């Protein structure tokens, strides 16, 4: 009965005997990149077919289109990792595992409800060729290999290696000793972390050089930010790794839609760290669903009046500028349109207060 319902054999089994024997002899099996690429090509054609079937109706097919978008991102990641392993053979084992995981993940999304994607179960890839790389035996052997030999070097240039080593040292020597108290005692991010990061130019990683940042004026380069974020997050995601996210979001918003006057005022201040910023999107009753944003922005004689509630605004206290998402047109359809971003200036303060409420018992 199971085979009739699911003829593509999506369930994973134990590794094959030959595969297991190779692992037991200390050899980590590998599959040729071209073999993975064939399966990834097959999956990409299914994604394209599904997109054509759904016709891009974001409201009607929101769940399916989100799944397809996520799958396309996974697919690109798998191709990128496999391409890196061609240049750096030390990455091949983990690339095999990652590609097998992506192939299985996407296939199983389709397998649950193929008809809603405009597919038939018989079109889905047979996972027999990749399932060995997801077996417990292979994963355990891969983990032991890394414990014994260390992780392979990532595929970055010499400049990025220097950046990585610098921020790894900072994370280990500065962030890690402070991280436990910050988390356990709900402390604010201290100046011992913020000030050195300002001096190292961290807040300008997404800002072009002409505005005092570190990003080249002539090309997009996010790899430096990725490397720094990864290393700071090793020390603490909350106390260091996520510090870069807010200035990046505000900088990109300013570069995309800000006036020249706004760019000249805000970008140098953000790049230097003189202006810490926060992003205010999430609302109490709707989370971060932009189609449901209710905070209103109404044009007045003196500018704009923002009226509504926001919550979970990281670094809101220490920030002197908030990037606020507000609804400027309540009648436009679809609902994810009619929104604008506002930069709201505020006094920066380093204080936290809590009000404890005793609520009546509700049955």
Regions found by a protein language model. Give the residues of each.
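N-terminal glycine-rich flavin-associated loop
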Residues: 237-261, 287
